Amino acid sequence: MNVPTAPTPNKHLNIPDLRFEKVFKKALHRELAPSSSLSRKAGVITKVVVRDVLLMPLLQSFVLSLALMGVKEWLSYIRLKGRTLGDRIRQRLFPI
């Protein structure tokens, strides 16, 4: 006889919704009040479009570019040290 077991809690990470339309509509519903006037709705739509389509990608790419510029010097230093360490190991293992 099969005994039903209690459902196990979902231990997986929730993946964020990356579909633009659903996220955009959710942002609009969050910003709009149900009894807003037409001019208020146009202003809110403009605000959401400017924020979600223009400003956030611009800000994200700016921060990523700054981070990559900051890491560039460190990565070139690590590459140089790795190359010299590799040369020393090769010379000790295979002397000419």
UniProtKB/Swiss-Prot annotation:
UniProt record, GO biological process: mitophagy
The entry's keywords: Membrane, Transmembrane, Transmembrane helix
Cellular compartments annotated: Membrane
Membrane topology type: Single-pass membrane protein
Molecular function per GO: mitochondrion autophagosome adaptor activity
TM annotation in the entry: 53-71
A Gene Ontology cellular-component term: membrane
Protein name according to UniProt: Uncharacterized protein YFR035W-A
Lineage start: Eukaryota, Fungi, Dikarya, Ascomycota, Saccharomycotina
Chief location of this protein within or outside the cell: membrane
InterPro entries linked to this entry: Atg43
Highest taxon, organism lineage: Eukaryota
